[in-house]
UniProtKB/Swiss-Prot annotation:
Residues binding ATP, per UniProt: 60-67
Subcellular location: Nucleus
Record's subunit section: Heteropentamer of various rfc subunits that forms a complex (RFC) with PCNA in the presence of ATP.
Protein role: The elongation of primed DNA templates by DNA polymerase delta and epsilon requires the action of the accessory proteins PCNA and activator 1.
PANTHER family: REPLICATION FACTOR C / DNA POLYMERASE III GAMMA-TAU SUBUNIT, REPLICATION FACTOR C SUBUNIT 2
SMART domains per record: AAA
Protein name: Probable replication factor C subunit 2
Cited SUPFAM superfamilies: P-loop containing nucleoside triphosphate hydrolases, post-AAA+ oligomerization domain-like
Species this protein is from: Dictyostelium discoideum
Keyword set, alphabetical order: ATP-binding, DNA replication, Nucleotide-binding, Nucleus
Pfam families in UniProt: AAA (PF00004), Rep_fac_C (PF08542)
Family as reported in the entry's similarity comment: Belongs to the activator 1 small subunits family.
Length: 338
């Protein structure tokens, strides 16, 4: 694989602290810079142009840009008043009833001079981790200060937010980012940071990130700090996950019903110290994205991997279980041939 060294620079980041974590250094500033979830982002663009912000809930998996999107929207709406008119709180750290009564209520009461049609914004991250009592108190504050303050919530599961709050908000949903979206962003970062990389190295980072941009940038920076060169071997060492090439080899051999050849690869991963969950998760991810297996066979593979994962999560996570999984996959392939 050819190693690429990039030399391009980006004027937007040249004045930033070089020691700043890349996940913060490359956090979007404008709504148009947000990666992925185009439909939801376009709705945020419309809100920023219209200027009338409702209370909103953005739900979705970690690392998909929920909080960054809210911050971009707040900047677009408030401009120079951003610092004094925005209050950001991570509800997973400060989620008690006292925090709602003291910090949030005091900011909601605070008088800030804003242009007509603009409101103060309270941003609560991971609000789904707040206690029910704190959420009830929050609902009351939303009612009392609705004329001056808007609330923007980010969460992983909107179902954990009480119904009275949900009914007062517009709910927007984010999904995991696609591999191509993450790859595009990674290429931009390695160009700016002048990081030497190989294509298989970026592919390994995408594989370990599983649609999480924050995880992808953290893994990229950690690999660069530890080894300099971004290649598959170095990424695997840093992320401590089963090597994708070994997993692909296991799946390919099982697709050929070749248990005898597949088992040594599995045994090597086990001897290297990887847990059953590590190996099963890697098998699932690689199988799901494989284009070398017929669709029906892929579905049967995923079903057997899912059953094995169920047993592993209930405590039956031995090498025997993984060996049994290989035999099941090989049996599926034999049935397909017949």
């Amino acid at each position: 694989m050819t190693t690429t060294t990039t030399t391009t620079t980006n004027t937007n980041t040249t004045n930033l602290d070089p020691l700043l974590p890349w996940v913060e250094k490359y956090r979007p500033i404008l709504i148009k810079d947000i990666v992925g979830n185009e439909e939801t982002v376009s709705r945020l663009e419309s809100i920023s142009k219209d200027g009338n912000l409702p209370n909103i809930i953005i739900s979705g998996p970690p690392g998909t840009g929920k909080t960054s999107s809210i911050l971009c929207l707040a900047r677009a709406l408030l401009g120079a008043n951003y610092k004094e008119a925005v209050y950001e709180l991570n509800a997973s750290d400060d989620r008690t009833l006292d925090v709602v009564r003291d910090k949030i209520k005091s900011f909601a009461m605070k008088k800030v001079t804003l242009p007509a049609g603009r409101h103060k914004i309270i941003i609560l991250d991971e609000v789904d981790s707040m206690t029910s009592g704190a959420q009830q108190a929050l609902r009351r504050i939303m009612e009392i200060y609705s004329g001056t303050t808007r609330f923007a919530f980010a969460c992983n599961q909107s179902t954990k937010i009480i119904e009275p709050i949900q009914s007062r908000c517009a709910v927007l949903r984010f999904t995991r980012l696609s591999d191509s979206q993450i790859l595009t962003r990674l290429r931009e970062v390695v160009q700016i940071e002048k990081v030497p990389y190989t294509d298989d190295g970026l592919a390994a980072i995408i594989f370990t990130a599983e649609g999480d941009m924050r995880q992808a940038l953290n893994n990229l920076q950690a690999t660069h700090s530890g080894f300099g060169l971004i290649n598959a071997e170095n990424v695997t060492k840093v992320c401590d996950q089963p090597h994708p090439l070994i997993i692909k080899q296991i799946i390919a051999l099982c697709a050929k019903s070749d248990f005898k050849e597949a088992y040594p690869f599995l045994k090597k991963l086990w001897d290297d110290g990887y847990s059953s969950i590590d190996i099963i998760s890697a098998l699932f991810s690689i199988t799901k994205s494989s284009n070398n297996i017929p669709e029906y066979q892929k579905l049967e593979f995923l079903k057997e991997i899912g059953f094995c994962n169920l047993r592993a999560t209930t405590g039956v996570n031995t090498l025997v279980q993984l060996t049994g999984l290989l035999s099941k996959l090989c049996l599926v392939s034999i049935k397909m041939k017949n």
